[in-house]
């Protein structure tokens, strides 16, 4: 690093806005939310989502409550084009959801973009071109007039093509890319020129998106930029001001919140902050920040763990354990004083009272989560902690979510005994909780065979003391097992590893089970010399623990399929 960074880096020039109003404002209603997980988020992945993962993400976004979703850059690839067509032709777009597509300012790309939208009832077409000085000079070699003319020509093309598709209600959106680094007066000039061509009205508004494509300043300066545009744009009553903050300086959430205070109506971002470089603004954090201030965000994260697992599986990116609201350690306290304060807070918290639990800005139950403290089990252990003792003493490496889950059982044990717990006691308790759980389903044995390219299982179990032989088929042993047992839960996560090495090696398998009637998720662990047997034992243990977490009505029908006369169940 340079001793004098001023020789290489310029400080950002503030906006002359001495009478700024945003610092005295508060946010009392949610902005319009626009998810760009399928476009900006997807293009930033090591391996972009395939069609199946894209569809899963789209349906998750709809379920959460997003009404505007940027789904593709149709002119960029045949894959994106085909996905838009599948959404339209497959009837996947709900009546209250509007899809958005992105296009650069070139006639052929615009034409291709509109072609992808044929037959859609309504859509947002998002036009952009870069306006910042370094892009004008280095990337495009254009003067200001050339950049403005490029945007105007593209705007005319969009208006002309849209007129030939009267069956679709189009909303036009324009972004001066790298707005955050563009001279503010020039950004206004280009935006005004585009909207003079589109001629939006208060009844049929256009969207002006003002992105911090690269976050270059403190959030207050971005807020000044937004307020200046809010005051000075022509046709303000016919425009929706949108912001698209990136997180290069780590302050995208603050920038978005201040931008709304400064006059923005709409925010573009991604779940959990996915996106180019350091990511787009995290829409989950923004929404739940509003929620903790008593404002309904209009997005439903009442099962945030499910949303998180979907996002991780679709993007192949892990969520940081300290990520606000959703990280595995967010509702975990290692400090004894923190644990004590939280425990006392829960003890006095009334169900209908205002939330006042120390160290916890939100009730984890509102997100479908629980408070679990990962306790320091033995001060003599050096590194301390349950996971450390199990790994060092018994070779069991706990996934983080299982570590948090098991810590509750250990906490109950230590509370009841009032004594320090030993590693041997932890191991015995672990086996009782997750490995030896044989009620109501007790594993007896199984056999596997392969026919017609599918795995077939013959599973012998005792269910509430009654011997049953169950048959199923699937794409692998676990798929076949789930079809055989026929319970209303699914394998949400599965992992396996060697427990010991050598001729007498044993394997440990961990299955995380979830279902509509199951509170949270339920873990099962299997340990056996045979890996497949270990995995079957893990799933059955997880099924037993899931059964314990459903209500009485769900319990009555939980094993209906298995208790009927067994016929082979084949997965599609």
Swiss-Prot record:
One annotated GO biological process: L-leucine biosynthetic process
Region (Regulatory domain): 437-572
UniProt keyword Cytoplasm, yes or no: yes
GO cellular component, one term: cytoplasm
EC number: 2.3.3.13
Enzyme class name: transferase
SUPFAM superfamilies in the record: 2-isopropylmalate synthase LeuA, allosteric (dimerisation) domain (SSF110921), Aldolase (SSF51569), post-HMGL domain-like (SSF89000)
Catalytic activity: 3-methyl-2-oxobutanoate + acetyl-CoA + H2O = (2S)-2-isopropylmalate + CoA + H(+)
Pathway: Amino-acid biosynthesis; L-leucine biosynthesis; L-leucine from 3-methyl-2-oxobutanoate: step 1/4
Localisation per UniProt entry: Cytoplasm
Cofactor: Mg(2+)
Function field: Catalyzes the condensation of the acetyl group of acetyl-CoA with 3-methyl-2-oxobutanoate (2-ketoisovalerate) to form 3-carboxy-3-hydroxy-4-methylpentanoate (2-isopropylmalate).
Protein name: 2-isopropylmalate synthase
Lineage: Bacteria, Pseudomonadati, Pseudomonadota, Betaproteobacteria, Burkholderiales
Protein encoded by which gene: leuA
């Amino acid at each position: 690093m340079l001793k004098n960074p001023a020789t290489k880096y310029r400080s950002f020039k503030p906006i002359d806005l001495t009478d700024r109003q945003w610092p005295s404002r508060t946010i009392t209603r949610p902005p319009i939310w626009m998810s760009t997980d399928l476009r900006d988020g997807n293009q930033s992945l090591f391996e972009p989502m395939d069609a199946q993962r894209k569809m899963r993400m789209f349906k998750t976004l709809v379920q959460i409550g997003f009404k505007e979703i940027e789904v593709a850059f149709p002119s960029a690839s045949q894959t994106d084009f085909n996905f838009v067509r599948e959404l339209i032709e497959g009837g996947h777009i709900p009546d209250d959801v509007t899809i958005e597509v992105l296009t650069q300012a070139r006639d052929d790309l615009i034409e291709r973009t509109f072609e992808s939208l044929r037959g859609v009832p309504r859509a947002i077409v998002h036009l952009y071109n870069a306006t910042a000085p370094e892009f004008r000079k280095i990337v495009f070699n254009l003067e200001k007039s050339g950049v403005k003319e490029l945007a105007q020509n593209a705007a005319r093309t969009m208006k002309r093509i849209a007129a030939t598709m009267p069956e679709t209600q189009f909303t036009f959106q324009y972004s001066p890319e790298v707005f955050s680094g563009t001279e503010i007066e020039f950004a206004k000039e280009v935006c005004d020129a585009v909207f003079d061509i589109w001629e939006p009205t208060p009844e049929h508004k256009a969207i002006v998106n003002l992105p911090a494509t690269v976050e270059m300043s403190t959030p207050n300066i971005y807020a000044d930029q937004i307020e200046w545009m809010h005051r000075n744009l022509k046709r303000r009553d016919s425009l929706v001001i949108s912001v698209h903050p990136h997180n290069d300086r780590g302050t995208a959430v603050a920038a978005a919140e201040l931008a709304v205070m400064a006059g923005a109506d709409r925010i573009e971002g991604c779940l959990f902050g996915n996106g180019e470089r350091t990511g787009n603004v995290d829409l989950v954090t923004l929404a739940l920040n509003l929620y903790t201030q008593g404002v309904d965000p209009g997005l439903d994260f009442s099962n945030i763990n499910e949303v998180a697992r979907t996002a991780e599986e679709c993007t192949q990116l892990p969520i940081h354990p300290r990520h606000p609201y959703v990280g595995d350690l967010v509702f975990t306290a290692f400090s004894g004083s923190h644990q004590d304060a939280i425990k006392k807070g829960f003890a006095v918290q009334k169900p209908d009272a205002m939330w006042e639990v120390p160290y916890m800005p939100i009730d984890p139950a509102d997100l479908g989560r629980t408070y679990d403290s990962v306790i320091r089990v033995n001060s003599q252990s050096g590194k301390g902690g349950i996971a450390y003792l199990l790994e060092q003493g018994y070779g069991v490496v706990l996934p983080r979510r299982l570590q948090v889950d098991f810590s509750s059982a250990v906490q109950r044990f230590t509370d009841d005994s009032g004594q320090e717990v030993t590693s041997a006691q932890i191991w015995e308790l672990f086996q009782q909780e997750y490995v030896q759980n044989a009620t109501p389903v007790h594993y007896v044995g199984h056999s596997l065979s392969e026919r017609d390219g599918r795995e077939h299982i013959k599973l012998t179990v005792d269910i509430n003391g009654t011997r049953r032989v169950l048959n199923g088929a699937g794409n692998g042993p676990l798929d076949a097992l789930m079809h055989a047992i026929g319970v209303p839960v699914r394998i949400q996560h599965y992992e396996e590893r060697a427990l010991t090495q050598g001729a007498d090696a044993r394997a440990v398998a961990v299955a995380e089970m979830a279902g509509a009637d199951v509170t949270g998720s339920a873990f099962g662990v299997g340990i056996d010399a045979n890996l497949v047997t270990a995995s079957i034992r893990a799933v059955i243990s997880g099924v037993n623990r899931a059964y314990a977490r459903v209500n009485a009505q769900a319990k009555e029908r939980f094993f209906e399929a298995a208790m009927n006369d067994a016929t082979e169940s084949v997965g599609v």
